[in-house]
Amino acid sequence: MKKDIHPNYSAVTATCTCGNTLQLNSTLGSDLHVDVCSNCHPFYTGQQKMVDTGGRVDRFNKRFGARRTTK
């Protein structure tokens, strides 16, 4: 392997907007500021909203489901 071609791998602090901080190892070299983390993301907190796509399926079946082909 060649010497001195790889970037330095150092400890970095990732700070979320909610105030949570994480210690990571990275080649970036400076601290990270992120918008969401596992403490405030809706998927992990249980505040996720479910999208109902049943209306589209019903509309499709109403338009095309009644048509039958006879051979």
From Swiss-Prot:
Gene3D superfamilies: Ribosomal protein L31
Cofactor: record remark: Binds 1 zinc ion per subunit.
Cofactor(s) this protein cannot do without: Zn(2+)
Keywords attached to this entry: Metal-binding, Ribonucleoprotein, Ribosomal protein, RNA-binding, rRNA-binding, Zinc
Binding annotation for Zn(2+): C16, C18, C37, C40
InterPro entries for the chain: Ribosomal_bL28/bL31-like_sf, Ribosomal_bL31, Ribosomal_bL31_A, Ribosomal_bL31_sf
Annotated Pfam families: Ribosomal_L31
Keyword Ribosomal protein belongs to the record: yes
Domain of life per record: Bacteria
A Gene Ontology biological process term: translation
GO molecular function terms attached to this record: metal ion binding; rRNA binding; structural constituent of ribosome
GO cellular component, one term: ribosome
Cited function: Binds the 23S rRNA.
Family per record: Belongs to the bacterial ribosomal protein bL31 family. Type A subfamily.
Complex formation: Part of the 50S ribosomal subunit.
Protein name as it appears in the record: Large ribosomal subunit protein bL31
Organism: Marinomonas sp. (strain MWYL1)
